[in-house]
């Protein structure tokens, strides 16, 4: 399994300084004792030092805990990636969201085809005005009118999701679909997250760690 996966790019990342950091740690830790990585963030320093030292990675942020559990566990023996992918694809939550959002998915697919043909405006509108969260909340977030095609797709989704407009099952799709990810990608990310929270560690953290976040888009 690929282990060199970068899912977050920190401002001030220490990734390029790892050999120098290790030199100083070696100098200060001549007895080869345990190393505590305070404010470990994405865990790149802990992962690098783990080659030689016993590491205690510490951070107050929960996302950091997820990253480090995934990076520092050393992999999961016997994992069947194809089976996991199949289970995620067939997850009831994913099928439900594909049904709820099908009008929007059709329209987005049409816009992508237009983009390939050199017609940029429809896709540009999705990126600029395609916030389903803002549409459902009736927030005044756009300049000018929304096209009838996009509004019809949004209206169809609104009617389909009904009382599930705030469901955690589609949180990524509502907040980030269209703006950061395509709506299809966002639905898949929601499915991966839902599947991950059904798993035990370390698989849970590994799945969450490898899921894209808006800052990676």
State each model region's role.
Residues 209-217:
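Single conserved hydrophobic/aromatic residue that forms the stacking wall/gate
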Residues 33:
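Nucleotide donor/acceptor-binding cores
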Residues 1-29:
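S-adenosyl-L-methionine
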Residues 196-206:
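Structural motif
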Residues 174-175, 179-183, 189, 205-208:
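Conserved Class I S-adenosyl-L-methionine-dependent methyltransferase catalytic core
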Residues 188-194:
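Mobile cap/lid helix-loop segments that border enzyme active or cofactor-binding sites
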Residues 36, 42-88, 92, 162, ...:
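SAM cofactor-binding core of SAM-dependent methyltransferases
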Residues 71-145, 162-164, 168, 175:
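Conserved phosphoryl-transfer catalytic core
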């Amino acid at each position: 399994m690929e282990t060199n996966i970068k899912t977050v790019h920190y401002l001030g990342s220490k990734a390029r300084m790892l050999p120098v950091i290790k030199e100083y740690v070696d100098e200060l830790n001549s007895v080869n004792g345990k190393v505590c990585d305070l404010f470990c963030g994405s865990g790149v320093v802990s992962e690098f030092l783990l080659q030689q030292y016993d590491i205690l990675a510490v951070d107050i942020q929960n996302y950091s805990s997820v990253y480090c559990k995934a990076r520092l566990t050393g992999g999961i023996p016997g994992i069947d990636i194809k089976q996991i992918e199949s289970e995620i694809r067939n997850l009831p939550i994913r099928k439900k969201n594909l049904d709820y959002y099908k009008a929007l998915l059709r329209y987005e697919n049409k816009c992508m085809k237009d983009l390939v043909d050199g017609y940029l405006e429809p896709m540009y509108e999705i990126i600029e005005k395609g916030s389903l969260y803002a549409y459902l909340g009736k927030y005044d977030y756009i300049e000018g009118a929304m096209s009838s095609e996009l509004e019809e797709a949004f209206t169809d989704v609104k009617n389909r999701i009904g009382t599930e407009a705030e469901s955690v099952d589609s949180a990524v799709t509502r907040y980030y679909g269209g703006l950061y990810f395509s709506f299809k990608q966002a639905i898949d990310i929601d499915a991966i997250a839902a599947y991950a929270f059904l798993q035990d560690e370390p698989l849970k953290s590994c799945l969450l760690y490898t899921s894209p976040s808006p800052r990676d888009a």
